[in-house]
Design a protein with these regions (language model features):
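Acidic-glycine-rich active-site phosphate/pyrophosphate-binding loop
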Residues: 1-16, 67-75
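Phosphate-handling active-site elements
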Residues: 1-12, 38-56
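Non-catalytic alpha-helical scaffold/packing segments enriched in small hydrophobic residues
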Residues: 8-15, 30-33, 59
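A short glycine/serine-rich beta->alpha loop
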Residues: 17-26, 81-86
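Conserved phosphate/anionic-ligand binding catalytic regions in large, soluble enzymes, centered on
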Residues: 22-36
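Iron-sulfur (Fe-S) cluster-binding segments and ferredoxin-like electron-carrier domains
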Residues: 35-38, 81-83
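C-terminal binding/interaction regions
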Residues: 52-112
Length: 112
């Protein structure tokens, strides 16, 4: 999906894990990673105004909220992952968050 895959992509996103540095207080790392992918695919390459990536990122956030009911790490862990009958693992959140992203990218006309 991303051109010229590089291990640097993983390094760039590493600090988002656990709601930013495992603080569990900020945006879910899976959501942050998806927004990074959106930026890589649709973001601007200079300082000129460009709303495409912003529009798609906003749509992604809305879909993430519809799916999980929250975007912040701590409430997600408490109410979606660790609750009895919940997902049980952040890996499952990551998987579902990626599926939400792939569906959205398909709607945007990106061949996957």
């Amino acid at each position: 999906m991303l051109p010229d895959w590089s291990p640097a992509y993983l390094r760039l996103s590493n600090g988002f894990a656990g709601g930013v540095g495992c603080s569990f207080q900020e945006l879910c790392g899976a959501a942050a990673g998806a927004v990074m992918v959106i930026g890589a695919l649709f973001g601007r390459e200079d300082l000129q105004p460009d709303e495409e990536a912003q529009r798609i990122a906003c749509r992604y956030r809305e879909r993430f909220l519809e799916t999980f009911g929250e975007t912040r790490c701590a409430p997600l862990r408490q109410n979606v992952v660790k609750v009895e009958g919940g997902l049980g693992s952040c890996a499952v959140v990551c998987e579902r968050a990626a599926m939400v992203l792939l569906e959205l990218l398909s709607e945007e006309g990106l061949a996957i």
